[in-house]
Amino acid sequence: MTKDSSSLVPDLWSSLEPLARVRAYQPRTVLFEGGARADGIYLIQKGKVRVWMREEGSRTILIDPAMPGTMLGLSEAIAQSTHKVSAEALIPTEAGFVSSEKLLQYLREHREICMQVVRILSEDLHALYHQFQALKGTYTRPGRRPNFNQRPM
C-alpha cells in the first residue's frame, strides 16, 4: 500500500490518472483481498477505503483508511505478487484502476516517472522499517545493522 505516498508527487498521480479506468464501489464492496494476485493499482479518487490485514489466528490489524489521493497496491503490482492487505469501500468510492501490464509498460517508457515510483517505494520501506523497530522496541542508530533477535528492554 502506498498511502502517504498519496501526497503523491503530482507528476506521478497526473501521469497515471489518464491510464486508469474509473470504477465505482458501494459501501462494503471489496476492492481486493489479501492473498489475491495483484493485477494492478488503485488510485482512490473519491470516498474512503478501509485497509486491513489478517494475522494468523484470524486477528485483524486495521491500517489507516485510504482517502482520496491514495494509491493502493503499487509494490504488489510492480512485483507481480499477491496483496499483503485487503481493501473495502466504507462509503461510496471511486477508484481509478491501472492494470499491472499497463503500469509496467508506462514505467518502461517514462523513466522519470519510474524514478518517482522507486523513490516512493523506498520511502514506504523506510517508514515500515521504523514502524517495525518501534514495535520491536529495538530501534537502532542510523548506520548500524538491526539485530532482530535482540529482546526489547
What is each stretch, according to the model?
Residues 1-153:
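Cytosolic regulatory regions built on CNB/CRP/Popeye-like sensor folds
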